[in-house]
Amino acid sequence: MTVGSGHRWPEPSMHPTEIAYAKINLALHVRRRRADGYHDIETIFAFAEHGDIVAAEPGPARLMLAGPFAPALAGEDPEDNLVMRAADGLCALAGEAARPAIRLDKRLPVAAGIGGGSADAAAVLRLLGRAYGIAADDPRVMTLAATLGADVPACVRSATVRGGERGDRLESIAADGLHGLPLLLVNPRVALPTGPVFAAWDRVDRGPLAPGDPLAAALAGRNDLEAPATLLHPVIGEVVTLLAAQPGAILARMSGSGATCFALFGSEADRDAADRALAHRRPDWWRLTSRLR
């Protein structure tokens, strides 16, 4: 099928797909509230090897939802979804008059502190950019990404980077020591929008993120949103405590504004043992075993 200015989409069995890699904030320091209502932050973004899956299919333009967490989005206006806004913007950059249909396989919890809509939108930018011959690091794509959300530029890159200002000023860093580290994500099945967590933050600037090696900086750092999120949902503290107590855990912390928490491990055996232990103790919690990209 030909779409827009002559782009031919693959047949149904060959629909291109892209992973919307789960985002992890290894550390997140909130420095101050800005005049525009956002907050200046310092963070280390990292990404799991797994996430939601987006696919582009022949039109008409529409958003099709699938996956275990699709029901959480079912009541939303598709045109308000970041995925469709990303598709609109990328097609405009490419000079395409028509959008393809987008299928979103929602495998990660919603409002969970691991990228969610930002990662999905970023995956669409990469996917359609590849189809239309526009590189993901094209300045126009990164500018578009920043208009969609503060985390979207980092999610477009989906590599370990430092983030400053709103989180959209990115600095490339050497992260060889993080690549491939076994990772366990746990969510107590609590949806936690960002706004209430920032509103509960005590507005105390506890200092900058340390420079240098990202793992060392993360270990010396903190997530300033973990305390207010835990005030809102004390179960988050239980998740972090259980993760930190697992043998072989290197770092356990809440990601983003929650409620998903993570632990990094020195070996896949330790990670898998922790996964089994948490499954036995709290079978109702959502879990994902992965590795850092």
Curated annotation (Swiss-Prot):
Keywords: ATP-binding, Isoprene biosynthesis, Kinase, Nucleotide-binding, Transferase. InterPro entries: GHMP_kinase_C_dom, GHMP_kinase_C_sf, GHMP_kinase_N_dom, IspE, Ribosomal_Su5_D2-typ_SF, Ribsml_uS5_D2-typ_fold_subgr. The active site is at K23, D151. ATP binds at P109, V110, A111, A112, G113, I114, G115, G116, G117, S118, A119. One of its GO terms (biological process) is isopentenyl diphosphate biosynthetic process, methylerythritol 4-phosphate pathway. Its EC number is 2.7.1.148. It holds the Pfam family GHMP_kinases_C. It comes from the Bacteria. Coiled coil: none annotated. It is an enzyme of class 2 (transferase). The keyword Transmembrane helix does not apply. GO terms for molecular function: 4-(cytidine 5'-diphospho)-2-C-methyl-D-erythritol kinase activity; ATP binding. Catalyzes the phosphorylation of the position 2 hydroxy group of 4-diphosphocytidyl-2C-methyl-D-erythritol. Belongs to the GHMP kinase family. IspE subfamily. This is 4-diphosphocytidyl-2-C-methyl-D-erythritol kinase.
